[in-house]
Swiss-Prot record:
Keywords: Kelch repeat, Repeat. Coiled coil: none annotated. Signal peptide: none annotated. Pfam families: Kelch_FKB95 (PF25210). Kelch repeats lie at residues 156-202, 203-250, 255-291, 292-345. This is Kelch repeat-containing protein At1g19470. The keyword Repeat applies. Residues 16-26 have a biased composition (Basic and acidic residues). PANTHER family: F-BOX DOMAIN-CONTAINING PROTEIN, F-BOX/KELCH-REPEAT PROTEIN SKIP4. It comes from the Eukaryota. It comes from Arabidopsis thaliana (Mouse-ear cress). Residues 1-55 are annotated as: Disordered. InterPro entries: F-box/kelch-repeat_ARATH, Kelch-typ_b-propeller, Kelch_1.
């Protein structure tokens, strides 16, 4: 079961987003992570008192099954009742039960930057009480560093590197999307900005993120999710990797694809770290735009120039070709909607967040702000893929030139 859940507004953290100086990002991230860790730790006496204050005459399994039926938007309030409920809601067993009952929900997290503020902040897409889609700030999470890389594993997001002033960050932060708590993880050996990152076989591979690649063994670092240890991987590296900041990256068929300024690279961890040299002879870079996502091991991206006659195209890694995503309703979307937007896989559908105001002409259709388009995909005979606009909503309105930095989805 895939839907967008109604959730309460979590934006009141006592901070005015217009007054967050960029130089406080690192400090605030660490402070929030430390605060979240401290909140999870209770004195032994207090924990015992909490456990004594709530008595359950029914088995734990039945309690878990009952809680699984409750909307996830009510979990934050329920977790504050006692340590029992806090631990239950943070447990993996509860979400396995929700999945087994067909109650899992897909959530979209977006990094939104306001015109006069730095950096971006986390927002979550939800449906309000009148069934309209809205973006609501998640105030308990730290700001999003510019140029960071984000990967999702289960119900967690890993925020890697980024830029603070002119300094490349070595940090990696774990965000638990079940509880909106975060904590710091071991740092990388090198600071990275606009690095490529992907998860293959329980390991996070982080590649590049430097101005220029130096002849050392730290161009690729790997984080083992079990041991929580970083490891540097030696070369050889492809000659085309001199410029190592990537505007987009994706994982398809357990291979990490990277879009550079001049070349595309493909790294294969399962083949002893081999590089697919044949990708240089394919049209991959011709149409790959930073607004992209992967659905069923195929790369979808926007094409504002409509090279193949349609605004969205899809790359098939097996035959290494681009094909159009057909559909009359896609033509109703203005071309400038795709120019500064982000795309995500929302339970097999495409979600695109973007501005409905042209940065060039100032043209605007409808309410100014961030708009969300939901596109249903259909595979037809002959391998053709068709798209149908399922909904188009203004999700964060009445503000000019909002910027969507990234968006991620995960199922909880």
């Amino acid at each position: 079961m895939v839907n967008i859940s109604e959730i309460p507004d979590d934006s009141n953290d006592g901070c005015d987003p217009n007054k967050k100086p960029e130089e406080q990002v690192l400090r605030r991230s660490r402070r929030i992570a430390t605060r979240n860790e401290n909140q999870n730790k209770k004195p032994k006496e207090e924990e015992e008192e909490d456990n004594r204050s709530v008595s359950f005459p029914i088995p734990n399994e039945l309690t878990e099954a009952c809680v699984a039926l409750i909307r996830k938007c009510d979990y934050p309030s329920l977790s504050s009742v006692s340590s029992y409920f806090f631990n239950l809601i943070a447990s993996s067993g509860l979400y396995e039960t929700r999945s087994r009952l067909g109650l899992s929900e897909t959530f979209l997290y977006a990094a939104i930057k306001f015109p006069d503020t730095n950096p971006a902040n986390w927002y979550i897409l939800h449906r309000n009480k009148v069934s309209s889609l809205r973006l609501t700030e998640v105030g308990s999470l730290p700001p999003v560093p510019w140029g960071c890389s984000v990967v999702t594993v289960g119900q967690e997001m890993y925020v890697i590197g980024g830029l603070l002033d002119i300094r490349r960050l070595q940090l990696m932060t774990l965000i638990d999307c079940r509880t909106h708590k975060c904590r710091s993880l071991p740092s990388m050996k090198r600071g990275r900005y606009k690095a490529a990152a992907g998860v293959v076989d329980g390991k996070i591979y982080v590649i590049g993120g430097f101005r220029m690649r130096k002849p050392d063994a730290e161009w690729i670092e790997v984080f083992d999710l079990k041991t929580q240890i970083w490891e540097s991987l030696p070369g050889p590296y492809p000659r085309t990797s001199a410029g190592s900041q990537f505007s987009a990256h994706a994982v398809m068929e357990d291979k990490l694809y990277m879009l550079g300024s001049k070349f595309c690279l493909v790294y294969e961890p399962k083949r002893n770290g081999e590089w697919d040299a044949s990708v240089g002879a394919t049209p991959l870079k011709d149409l790959w735009d930073k607004t992209c996502c992967v659905v069923d091991d195929m790369l979808y991206t926007t094409d504002p120039r409509r090279t193949l006659g349609h605004p969205i195209v899809v790359y098939h890694p097996k035959d290494k070709t681009w094909r159009p995503v057909k559909g009359e309703s896609l033509w109703s979307l203005p071309s400038y909607f795709f120019s500064k937007s982000e795309m995500a896989n929302f339970g097999g559908k495409l979600v695109i967040l973007g501005s409905n105001k042209s940065y060039v002409t100032g043209d605007c259709i409808g309410e100014k702000g961030i708009w969300c388009v939901m596109i249903e995909l259909e595979k037809r005979e002959g391998g053709e893929i068709w798209g149908k606009v399922e909904s188009l909503d203004c999700v964060l309105g009445d503000i000019n030139f909002l910027s969507v930095r990234l968006c991620q989805t995960l199922t909880i």
